[in-house]
């Protein structure tokens, strides 16, 4: 965004470089970026459908339907799993661009850019952990509920 790109800071420089890393991925037809882009419509649909199927299955006592809802939650986990290396690669490319073009002059600037990009990457690690946790949580609700009824 212009607000980020026009700020005179190492953080802004690192964020812009990360986005340029995505542009490089796109220009080089980076396979995981293409895969992630292809998954977006499916993930949008299953993220909407999953909770509906899960709740309907629980309320109607049709547990196979609820399991289909849980399977829909798996779409978010797969998307997060694919997204993580895409984002790490964009950060790696961005940092390399900054170094190659002499935009990071001091050790502190290099460390600062690396810290910003690492912190950004950790948000994707957290998203993956959250998606897996959600999948396991709803799966355990169904799995535990089935054991009690048997």
Model-derived segments and spans:
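Hydrophobic transmembrane alpha-helical segments that form the core helix bundle
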Residues: 42-93
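Polar-ligand-bearing catalytic/cofactor-coordination segments
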Residues: 1-44, 78-150
């Amino acid at each position: 965004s212009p607000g980020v790109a026009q700020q005179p800071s190492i953080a802004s420089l690192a964020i812009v470089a990360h986005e340029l890393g995505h542009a490089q991925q796109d220009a080089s037809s980076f396979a995981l970026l293409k895969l992630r882009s292809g998954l977006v419509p499916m993930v949008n649909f299953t993220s909407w459908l999953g909770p509906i199927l899960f709740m309907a299955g629980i309320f109607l006592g049709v547990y196979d339907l609820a399991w289909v809802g849980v399977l829909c939650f798996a779409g978010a986990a797969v998307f997060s799993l694919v997204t993580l290396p895409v984002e790490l690669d964009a950060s790696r490319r961005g940092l390399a661009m900054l170094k190659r073009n002499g935009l990071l002059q001091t050790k502190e600037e290099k460390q600062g850019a690396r810290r910003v990009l690492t912190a950004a990457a950790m948000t994707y690690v957290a998203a993956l952990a959250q998606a897996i946790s959600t999948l396991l949580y709803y799966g355990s609700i169904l799995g535990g509920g089935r054991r009690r009824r048997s």
